[in-house]
Amino acid sequence: MIARILIPVVVFTLLPYLWIYKRYGKLRLKSLWQRVLFWLPAFVVIAYSAYITILPNFLPRNPVLIDIWFVMMAVCAVPQFVFSLFSLFGWCCMRLLHGHRNWGKLLGLVVGAVAFFCFIYGFTEGFPKMQVKRITIYVPNLPKSFEGYRIVQFSDIHLGSYYGWRGHLPQRDIDSINAEKPDLICFTGDLQNVTPDELPEYQALLSSLKARDGVMSVLGNHDYTYYMDVDDEQEIAALEKRMRNFQRSCGWRLLMNEHVTVHRGADSIYVAGTENYDKPKRTNVRKALYGIRLGSFVLMLQHMPKQWRETWPSTINKEKDEDGDVIGPDRKDSLVVAPQLTLSGHTHAGQVSVLGLRPSMFTPYDYGLFEEEGCQLYTTSGLGGTVPIRIGATAEIVVITLKRK
């Protein structure tokens, strides 16, 4: 992860120190040891970041190393960057307006301090925080027997991020899900951070999830080997098989471009699920929907919300035949059913949200409930993350009640 942003980290760290040294420190730091102490935090951050980049895989196996990196950034880089931005802006205004005081410097001190405390809060208090969100979704073709059907969705738990003082959080989350006594539990991907080695200690806990119609799941981008430093095809296949077998050993119904039927007496609905949409791309929507009659209610599980567009009626039915009332995986001209409700995760709601502004807002359908062409999508903020920080984008489990429109 750090390897992909090493150059921005170096720039983000060094430039503020250069500005502060040039504007405020050059005349005050007269001795060599004073200058060394001034520059030491910046070079420690850069050296540590470089060290992490040479470790194999997307993330180091020991998550404590990432925690140390975030603390170092919070102390040695973020406040300095914020202060420098305001100081530079104030200096430019002072020069343009021929003023005598740089008010940006004072404002930068305040905002830099706020940024520091927000960073620490998000790391220590914001990340563990969790809410139970309840929504009611109305659909036109829900069978009578499924009126009031309750689904609990959880996503992006990233079990490799829980250890030490965070170790109790998965138990809390699973207990909260079971307390809802749902009809169906849906997991929408990213069980691990990097490797299946993170999972065995949680098998008993995940197996304890209980719902009348069981637990159904799909794989997220982290549930493959994309973030591992592995090239051997046999090893890749073995690692991905371990992930699939682990979920099945927990009693979950893993949906790999396929669907299952849920019955209530003579009525039924379908739950479909696709593999990952991007990096790696394994998805096959038409295969997942094969055999579903038109007019049926379909709940679709997809890890990435940007794939939702592929399930809209205008997209999925670009070509139609005269009597194609059954979906075919290979017949591109067959008439296909558009899932009325899709559940996704992946975005974590940006993990930082301030006044409704969040990094993921430029990603389509990044958080919340959306409706297009009679189809609805709910994208959850998820429960965890590879980056152990949340500010304003609270982790959640989602309780969905289905009602007939």
Q: Which residues make up each language-model segment?
A:
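Non-catalytic terminal accessory segments
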Residues: 1-128
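Short N-terminal secondary-structure initiator segments
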Residues: 1-10, 96-101, 128-133, 157-170, ...
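Short, charge-rich amphipathic segments
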Residues: 16-27, 97-114, 136-144, 172-185, ...
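Beta-strand secondary-structure signal
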Residues: 85, 134-136, 399
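Generic structural motif
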Residues: 88, 95, 140-142, 405
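Hydrophobic alpha-helical transmembrane segments in integral membrane proteins
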Residues: 116-142, 161-165
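Soluble catalytic domains of enzymes that build or remodel membrane lipids, polysaccharides, and related
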Residues: 145-405
